[in-house]
Amino acid sequence: KQAETLDAIQNGADEIDYVVNLTELKEKNYNYVQKEMTAIVETCREHHVLSKVIFENCYLTREEKIALCQIAREVQPDFIKTSTGFGTGGATFEDVELMRKTLGDSVKIKAAGGIRDLETALRMIELGVSRIGSTASVAIVEELIQKNKA
């Protein structure tokens, strides 16, 4: 993954998203997960590129989410991200609350997947999300514009 990260950067990427190794995480090989995260985040930092670590929360237990947040708190990627949007579930309020509580303010959170309306987007922001990934972003902005006109 580190070589792929460097290749993407050399080909013009200014942000890198990568999914943690779920097999190693499920095996509780947290040392491996931390080393991989560190290698990718440091490669991004060296080239002034944003790093986003995707948890894919829909496949994780509460314990695994907490462990990943603790690792991220040490490694300091620019963002942690709830999901790719391709898994069995997207961002939930519960997950975002847990991530923010465990991380503190040291790492930004991107909520992705399942955010389809203004109310949900605003609630995510209230919970501490810095970015939202949504295929409904245009509809959400249009809803905000209409709300502000009223």
What feature does the model see in each segment?
Residues 1-109, 117-142, 147-150:
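Alpha/beta enzyme core
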Residues 112:
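Short hydrophobic "strand-cap" motifs at the C-terminus of beta-strands
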